[in-house]
UniProtKB/Swiss-Prot annotation:
Residues 130-147 have a biased composition (Acidic residues). Zn(2+) binds at residues 77, 83, 104-105. The modification Phosphothreonine is found at residue 483. N-glycosylated; contains sialylated glycans. InterPro entries: BTB/POZ_dom, Ion_trans_dom, K_chnl_volt-dep_Kv, K_chnl_volt-dep_Kv3, K_chnl_volt-dep_Kv3.1, SKP1/BTB/POZ_sf, T1-type_BTB, VG_K_chnl. A motif (Selectivity filter) lies at residues 400-405. Voltage-gated potassium channel that opens in response to the voltage difference across the membrane and through which potassium ions pass in accordance with their electrochemical gradient. The mechanism is time-dependent and inactivation is slow. Plays an important role in the rapid repolarization of fast-firing brain neurons. Can form functional homotetrameric channels and heterotetrameric channels that contain variable proportions of KCNC2, and possibly other family members as well. Contributes to fire sustained trains of very brief action potentials at high frequency in pallidal neurons. SMART domains: BTB. The chain crosses the membrane at residues 191-209, 248-267, 277-295, 309-331, 345-366, 415-436. GO terms for cellular component: axolemma; axon terminus; calyx of Held; cell surface; dendrite membrane; neuronal cell body membrane; plasma membrane; postsynaptic membrane. It comes from Homo sapiens. This is Voltage-gated potassium channel KCNC1. Residues 1-190, 268-276, 332-344, 437-511 are cytoplasmic.
Length: 511
């Protein structure tokens, strides 16, 4: 039978657009939905119009044109004017494996999935800005029970494994948690966020002022020491921080402690809470203050040693600046950008390490050319006494800082220095655009999620019922073997899960 035979032609109406092809074309991909149309009993299993002699599918006509071309040419391309999830659903419906997408279109196809993963990573970002109208009844009031459950899942990833029974806990636990965790959940949550931001800024300001000599006057102190035959008085001078700064820091720590305890108590998932790096920073920044206050009244040598150590580790208080990431989207975007650009940073470090090693060696030997004949070390006239010293100069030069503490003094060394500076500019410039693009992508996604209106009711189409045109066949008289039984076709949702998991289903699977 030739391809030009009228009986070999088949008409497929997809969303009102008629497509004509040959049955032999549809047979090129066995086990798919279109391949079943080429079988003799297809009229009884699909929506077939005998008067128009066509099969009808209520699907996207534009995407189907690309899928049909895949049967004709063997190359699957992704349309640029179709959203990625829609194209993914269409591939699953027609039984096409996503890994068949051509390499030229793979990045376009994957873009939507990367965007979804990025949006999920901003779990603490607000989903709507209309909470002012819904929070008049109480703190963290986000609507009915479904809204509270959605808020809890969005902020805490799961329900509490140790949730307490009773209506009070079930009603107020997600509200109090949102009050301290999500500044955009309600008006009262914004008040808490402003208070937290105020104490963070005050604490950091106090930390900086404590290092100024104006607030560290020198005072004379005496200490009675026990000696072998009695006691003796020892006089010494010591810098002592102004008391009002300590009181201010104490007030800030009281607030941070209250905030931390409330978040611990009302957290739906204690394990996830403990694993969170920001929560670890909160605890580490609070603990030294209480240890210092508790040991300040002791006079033993061990207590004084511990106090001295705690004064040294006061710098951990500056880590509270990272608490601002809960309140500013831009800081969260920066954190996600740094994590997403790990490969680029590693590449930059490798390039710099190679350049530093090469140019430190070159400058060392280049400077030795101008050595005096009576100089046995050949290094009295230059700063570059050895190659390790040249590492510092190479780093400063390649990063275009140029402190000027070390510089070449011979014409050959100057030539190496010029090459080092040019190489540094080119090396740093290569990965920077990728990092900037990542920041722009994450920032736009964060802004999109922040302004995304809350969906009150999501449209979910009815699944295909047995006997409907979109329901796949229960019995397939196909000569092609299948890994599944004909009475258990692979659902469209399962195809989506397989594609997202990166597993490649066999071509013979029933769809």
């Amino acid at each position: 039978m030739g391809q030009g035979d009228e009986s070999e032609r088949i008409v497929i109406n997809v969303g009102g657009t008629r497509h004509q092809t040959y049955r032999s074309t549809l047979r090129t991909l066995p086990g798919t939905r279109l391949a079943w149309l080429a079988e003799p009993d297809a009229h009884s299993h699909f929506d077939y119009d005998p008067r128009a002699d066509e099969f009808f599918f209520d699907r996207h006509p534009g995407v189907f044109a690309h899928i049909l071309n895949y049967y004709r040419t063997g190359k699957l391309h992704c349309p640029a004017d179709v959203c990625g999830p829609l194209y993914e659903e269409e591939l699953a419906f027609w039984g096409i494996d996503e890994t068949d997408v051509e390499p030229c279109c793979w990045m376009t196809y994957r873009q939507h999935r990367d965007a979804e993963e990025a949006l999920d990573s901003f779990g603490g970002a607000p989903l709507d800005n209309s909470a002012d109208d819904a929070d008049a009844d109480g703190p963290g009031d986000s609507g009915d029970g479904e809204d509270e459950l959605e808020m809890t899942k969005r902020l805490a990833l799961s329900d509490s494994p140790d949730g307490r029974p009773g209506g009070f806990w079930r009603r107020w636990q997600p509200r109090i948690w949102a009050l301290f965790e999500d500044p955009y959940s309600s008006r009262y949550a914004r008040y808490v966020a402003f208070a937290s931001l105020f104490f963070i800024l005050v604490s950091i300001t106090t930390f900086c002022l404590e290092t100024h000599e104006r607030f560290n006057p020198i005072v004379n102190k005496t200490e009675i020491e026990n000696v072998r035959n009695g006691t003796q008085v020892r006089y010494y001078r010591e810098a002592e921080t102004e008391a009002f700064l300590t009181y201010i820091e104490g007030v800030c720590v009281v607030w941070f402690t209250f905030e931390f305890l409330m978040r611990v108590i009302f957290c739906p998932n204690k394990v996830e809470f403990i694993k969170n790096s920001l929560n670890i920073i909160d605890f580490v920044a609070i603990l030294p203050f209480y240890l210092e206050v508790g040991l300040s009244g002791l006079s033993s040598k061990a207590a004084k040693d511990v106090l001295g150590f705690l004064r040294v580790v006061r710098f951990v208080r500056i880590l509270r600046i990272f608490k601002l990431t809960r309140h500013f989207v831009g800081l969260r975007v920066l954190g996600h950008t740094l994590r997403a650009s790990t490969n680029e940073f590693l590449l930059l470090i490798i390039f710099l390490a190679l350049g530093v090693l090469i140019f430190a060696t070159m400058i060392y030997y280049a400077e030795r050319i101008g050595a005096q004949p009576n100089d046995p070390s050949a290094s009295e006239h230059t700063h570059f006494k050895n190659i390790p010293i040249g590492f510092w100069w190479a780093v400063v030069t390649m990063t275009t800082l140029g402190y000027g503490d070390m510089y070449p003094q011979t014409w050959s060394g100057m030539l190496v220095g010029a090459l080092c500076a040019l190489a540094g500019v080119l090396t740093i410039a290569m990965p920077v655009p990728v990092i900037v693009n990542n920041f722009g992508m994450y920032y736009s996604l964060a802004m999109a999620k922040q302004k995304l209106p809350k969906k009150k009711k999501k449209h979910i189409p009815r699944p295909p019922q047995l006997g409907s045109p979109n329901y796949c066949k229960s019995v397939v008289n196909s000569p092609h073997h299948s890994t599944q039984s004909d009475t258990c076709p692979l659902a469209q949702e399962e195809i989506l899960e397989i594609n997202r998991a990166g597993r490649k289903p066999l071509r013979g699977m029933s769809i």
